[in-house]
Amino acid sequence: MSSSPSPRFVSRLTRNTLVLILAGGRGSRLMDLTTWRAKPAVPFGGKFRIIDFTLSNCINSGIRRIGVLTQYKAHSLIRHLRLGWGSLRGDFGEFVEILPAQQRTEGSWYRGTADAVYQSLDIVRMHDPDYVLILAGDHVYKMDYGPMLARHVETGADVTVGCLEVPVEEASAFGVMAVDGDNRVVRFQEKPADPPSIPGQSDRALASMGIYIFNRAFLFNQLIADARKESDHDFGKDIIPSLIDQARVIAFPFRDAATGGQAYWRDVGTIDAFWRTNLELVGVNPQLNLYDKEWPIWTHQEQLPPAKFVFDDDDRRGMAVDSMVSGGCIISGAYLRRSLLFSSVVVEDGSRVEDAVILPEAHIEPGCRIRKAVIDKHCRLAAGTVIGEDPEEDARRFHLSPGGVVLVTPDMLGQEIHNVYT
């Protein structure tokens, strides 16, 4: 964050809540994009990292006690947290604390989402919260967690599960639940092959967001019991299903506060979803509003000059249409259409970039043609490179997604990346 955010929505309830963000996953469906970074550290939206959305939701909700559990290739994530999220007031009991995997129990790394929290129980005890809010650090959405906390207390729940409606054909990727008239969860299946639909809505299913609120003592008891069992030590696979018949598990539907309809939430866990969700932002009125001053997305703000567009000749003109171009970029006699450029990208004379997501510090030399692609950080494309026009050639040289998006990384280009930050 460029400066410490002003207090908002802070109450006794939010003050007595500890957040644990699960940020240790690789996100293997993002292919080579997560070879050198954890999924929550993947750049998104022109200037952010994916985890910034979850962290910003916490800050904007008035929750200022946050632990981030890391494991897989965490250096770039830890560096980002240190640079961008170190301005909270420790003397006021506010913090973003990094909790790396340390083999605290029996010398093992995190065996699942529940085990990750179990291995940090001593830290949770030290902070002594009334409630523990468990979040995933790899989704893109805006959510005020305050109403969910209030609902958890009002209903006397042992655990509250955030949920949303999804198309039934996509529900197999989620934990799917059924609820009664009071939103009490009566059935929960993790990634079922044949997901049940919502009664009266045969094309929709109620899916878990991977957001859980536990009463502290109840959480401790469940995690200690699970650690003694042979299981996957996972909230969705083990903890939540085991509680349906013996505890009060309440669903909290995530809805748009203004309309009451379906709220914006994206899992950017595949190359196609990552590309599509980024390019949604270049629309005239995207559903995810990054310009909303009432719910800002905080991040580390590198000090960079404004983007620059140069040359206005008949044969070369630096211009961008239906695009977002971040600070530090130089568009030198090149044409951009419906693309999103992160910071410090250079596009040289005669190059044409369409339907592309270009990550920071990429350099596109003269005469390149790029279409429907994701270009990773630090890539340097040689003059005349063509991407996105010949699927067979793209598949041979790069990674071609099922949806036809071409992923290009420095390693695919034979470029050294071991000595740069990711």
Curated annotation (Swiss-Prot):
Single GO biological process annotation from the record: glycogen biosynthetic process
A Pfam family assignment: NTP_transferase
Family annotation (PROSITE patterns): ADP_GLC_PYROPHOSPH_1 (PS00808), ADP_GLC_PYROPHOSPH_2 (PS00809)
Pathway where this protein functions: Glycan biosynthesis; glycogen biosynthesis
Residues binding alpha-D-glucose 1-phosphate, per UniProt: Y110, G175, E190, K191, S208
The keyword Transferase is annotated on this UniProt entry: yes
EC number(s) from the headed UniProt entry: 2.7.7.27
Keywords tagged on the record: ATP-binding, Carbohydrate metabolism, Glycogen biosynthesis, Glycogen metabolism, Nucleotide-binding, Nucleotidyltransferase, Transferase
Signal peptide (from-to): none
MF term (GO), any: ATP binding
Catalytic activity: alpha-D-glucose 1-phosphate + ATP + H(+) = ADP-alpha-D-glucose + diphosphate
Class of enzymatic activity (EC top level): transferase
Residues forming coiled coils: none
Keyword hit for Transferase: yes
Gene3D superfamilies assigned to the protein according to its UniProt record, in alphabetical order: Hexapeptide repeat proteins, Spore Coat Polysaccharide Biosynthesis Protein SpsA, Chain A
Family: Belongs to the bacterial/plant glucose-1-phosphate adenylyltransferase family.
NCBIfam families given in the database record: glgC, PRK00725.1, PRK00844.1
Oligomeric and partner information: Homotetramer.
Function: Involved in the biosynthesis of ADP-glucose, a building block required for the elongation reactions to produce glycogen. Catalyzes the reaction between ATP and alpha-D-glucose 1-phosphate (G1P) to produce pyrophosphate and ADP-Glc.
UniProt-recorded name of the protein: Glucose-1-phosphate adenylyltransferase 2
Organism taxonomic ancestry: Bacteria, Pseudomonadati, Pseudomonadota, Gammaproteobacteria, Chromatiales
Gene: glgC2
